[in-house]
Amino acid sequence: MPTFAPQHCTAVLASVTVVDAVAPHQLTLPTPCAGWDLAELLTHMTAQHHGFAAAARGHGADADVWRAERFVRAVADDPAGTYAAAARDVLAAFDTEGIDEKPFAMPEFGPNVVIPGEQAIGFHFVDYAVHAWDVAVTIGAPFALPDDVIAALVPVAMAVPDGDFRDADGSPFARALPSADHDDFARVLRHLGRDPGWSQAYSTVTGA
């Protein structure tokens, strides 16, 4: 298993706790993910869990396992239950001997892209630590990850490259924002194109 496996699990479970607090009327709220309301973000998060789980089991090359449209209705009907089931699926799939060396097919990164399991789980770790924050600030809920999770997250997240490709449609992250933060999680958020000060009020004023 990757060295950060326990911290990855903690981050995913933290995202489950945050999503469990989502109320139905909040699903139309805008999020820090430009162009996505909360229902769309949760649908994406649910689909990605199942996609990574399929990749861990050797089926990642099938584009259908990543398709978010499959979960639109389920998320609308039961966001917390649908999301928790997806999180359980991916954690079970990752809890396998030798998973860090196993090849993961990742068609979202390009045709025939295959990466080692440790790298794929690293991407997943970064995604869900940040998406948990996205959901929390969207609904105005408190959010904090344990120090050991942030310490494990920082080198993985800061290794994500920046560049013109982040301007492309479908890029997982916007361009990195300038940072003078001493808070490690805030540095991660800025490196991944998030403003740590984002709020619903901010979104309304700026149109973000």
Q: What are the roles of these predicted feature ranges?
A:
Residues 41:
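N-terminal cationic and glycine-rich segments that engage phosphates or anionic surfaces
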Residues 2-7, 11-14, 21-34, 51-71, ...:
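Structured surface interface patches that mediate subunit assembly and partner/cofactor docking
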Residues 44-45:
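Glycine-rich loop at the start of a catalytic domain that most often binds anionic cofactors/ligands
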